[in-house]
Amino acid sequence: MSNDKDSFNVSDLTSALKDEDRAGLVNALKNKLQNLAGQHSDVLENLTPKIRRRVEVLREIQGKHDEIETKFREERAALEAKYQKLYQPLYNKRYEIVNGATEVEGAPEDAKMDQGDEKTAEEKGVPSFWLTALKNNDVISEEITERDEGALIYLKDIKWCKIEEPKGFKLEFFFDQNPYFKNTLLTKAYHMIDEDEPLLEKAIGTEIDWYPGKCLTQKILKKKPKKGAKNAKPITKTEDCESFFNFFNPPQVPDDDEDIDEERAEELQNLMEQDYDIGSTIREKIIPHAVSWFTGEAIEGEEFEIDNDDEDDIDEDEDEDEEDEDEDEEEDDEDEEEEVSKTKKKPSVLHKKGGRPQVTDDQQGERPPECKQQ
């Protein structure tokens, strides 16, 4: 489909996202699909009767496939729910160990020798467990600043749960009491139009109740007054800054149509995709395999996968390079033959009395074959 009306482009997404009402968004998508379906019916009408009948049978086969796929998704959802319940006791045990609520049996001898050390005696559980796990993931580490680390050491646990109405999932970040904000629970909910595709409707985060002067998503700039100014005080200015805690204030689409253009719509779409990527990474990678991210084992696993992909790419590139080199050699040979023949047919220079040879217009800037490598 090459026509503008046939493509579901950024402007279509923008017009859909402008409606905060979920039903309105779904209807906008349905209308678009109905329009496309109408265009497909036009295609069928242009087919010969025999071919049209064959396509109709193919559509019947597709319908049966879709019924099986629907059943698969239902059973998969039930299976995921079943195993999520089986995971939960393990997550509870992990929480107790990480936060020092329970002690593991069989402590190593060298740890017992350090019991007299005051610092070791004070440390319970696994300090900075979640901070380290998050920092070891490339997607999440890009969001964490040095200032954020002071607050993230108070992170006790991360959980997630499904949301049934509207469909989606919610992340829960449990914090110990800390000097940065009053909240002990920060949440981030993703509302989806379709979980299987997935199509994100919107994201909602907790408003953080910062203590005075402790906000990590803003920085205060002080500007010195001009020299000679009487009773002048430093000018203070507050600016937004990069922080992991911006995650709880997701990008919002303006209500007014006039407040957004196509360029801004594309920017918002990219921000929403990035935001969803962070949330899904925490849900699918960090929470289930937290200790592997803490130790760094998960990094090695991902690097191994990336290296395999790179090796395949390198092999393909080498093959392509060899082919290109062969083609270049053949082209060079052809060029040399052409240039030699041109030299024989036409003089490369024209002599004028009392002057140097001058290059003709049709050969100006050409080099003889032996100069190509210079």
Curated annotation (Swiss-Prot):
Annotated disulfide bonds: none
Gene3D superfamilies per the UniProt record, alphabetical: 1.20.5.1500, Nucleosome assembly protein (3.30.1120.90)
GO biological process: DNA repair; DNA-mediated transformation; double-strand break repair via homologous recombination; nucleosome assembly; somatic cell DNA recombination
Tissue: Ubiquitous.
Propeptide: 372-374
Record note on domains: The acidic domain is probably involved in the interaction with histones.
Family of the protein in this entry: Belongs to the nucleosome assembly protein (NAP) family.
Function: May modulate chromatin structure by regulation of nucleosome assembly/disassembly. May function in nucleotide excision repair (NER). Involved in somatic homologous recombination. Could be involved in response to abscisic acid (ABA) and to salt stress.
Full protein name: Nucleosome assembly protein 1;3
Gene name as annotated: NAP1;3
